[in-house]
Amino acid sequence: MSLQIGRTERARSPVFVFAHKRQLLHGRCSTIDNANCSTCSMKINSTCTLTALPIAALPGPRTTSHYSTAAANWCYATVAPRARSSTIAASLGTPAPSSSASFRPKLIRTTPVQAAPVAPALMDAAVERLKTGFEKFKTEVYDKKPDFFEPLKAGQAPKYMVFACADSRVCPSVTLGLEPGEAFTIRNIANMVPAYCKNKYAGVGSAIEYAVCALKVEVIVVIGHSRCGGIKALLSLKDGADDSFHFVEDWVRIGFPAKKKVQTECASMPFDDQCTVLEKEAVNVSLQNLLTYPFVKEGVTNGTLKLVGGHYDFVSGKFETWEQ
C-alpha cells in the first residue's frame, strides 16, 4: 500500500523536515514514525537516524510532503509544530490532526520514491563551494610552495599505488598525509581489485599496468575501512537473487571468496562484526588478485614491488597495515 499525502497549509512556525537516510546500498525503510523508524525492512539490522533540517534548505516544491533526492537517497516528511494540516494518508485511515494537536506524521512506503530535481540555487552553491575550495588551496598552499610544485610540472614519480574506497569519509591523501605526486590513487566501491582479465575491468587493469610498468611504483596498498557500505552490500547478497543495483552488486562480487570465508568461520558473530572481519578479508582477496597480473607477480618475485594491506577505522581513529 503506497502512501498518499495531502498538502500542508502554511504555519506560523518554521517548517522542518525529518530526513531519514537509507544506510544501505539496497534495503528499504518501510515505515517512518516522526523521529523513530518503527519498522525497517532493510536486509541488515541497523539504526535508522533522523535529522531535523530546515525545509528551506531542501530542493523541490515546498508543498510536497514526501519526496527524495537521487544523490542522497533521503526520504523527507514535512513537520510543522502545531501545523494546520490537511488530511494525511487517507488510505491509512489516519484522521487529520486538529490545530491544537501535536502533528506526528506517519509515512509508509513500499515502493521507491521518484527523485525530485535539485533547486538551481543549491546546485550553484555546490559549484561555488568547489571554486572557493580551490582558491583557498591556491593562496594557502600552491602559491606558498613553488619549489614543491615546480618539479610536478615535468611529470610524476609516485612511490605508492593506493586502492581506496570511493566512500566520501575515506580520503587516503588526508588520512595518510600523502602529498601531491606521492601516490597514484584508484578509488572504487569497497576498494576492490579484480583478478587479471584482458576482457573485463580494463579500467582497473590499465591503472595497475601503468603504475607498475610505466611509473615503477614500489608499493601497492589496498586500504579497507570501517562501516563500508560496499562490504555490507556484499555480505547481504543472496545467491541467485536479482540485483537491486546491477553495477554495484556485480562489482562487489569480486569479494565473494572473502564473504564465503567469513560466513563459514564467523557464522555465530553478529552481522556488524562479520562486516568488520569482511572489510579486512576483502582486502586480502584483492591482494591475492593483484598477484594474478603478470607484471605485478614479476615485481614481487624480483623484490622491486611490495603488496600491503591496510584498514582505516574512522570510528576509533586507528590504522593498521599488513604485508601480503
Swiss-Prot record:
Main location: plastid
GO BP term (any one): carbon utilization
CDD domains in the cross-refs: beta_CA_cladeB (cd00884)
Reaction(s) this enzyme catalyzes, per UniProt: hydrogencarbonate + H(+) = CO2 + H2O
Annotated signal peptide: none
GO molecular function: carbonate dehydratase activity; zinc ion binding
Subunit details: Homohexamer.
Protein name per its UniProtKB record: Carbonic anhydrase, chloroplastic
Species per Swiss-Prot/TrEMBL record: Hordeum vulgare
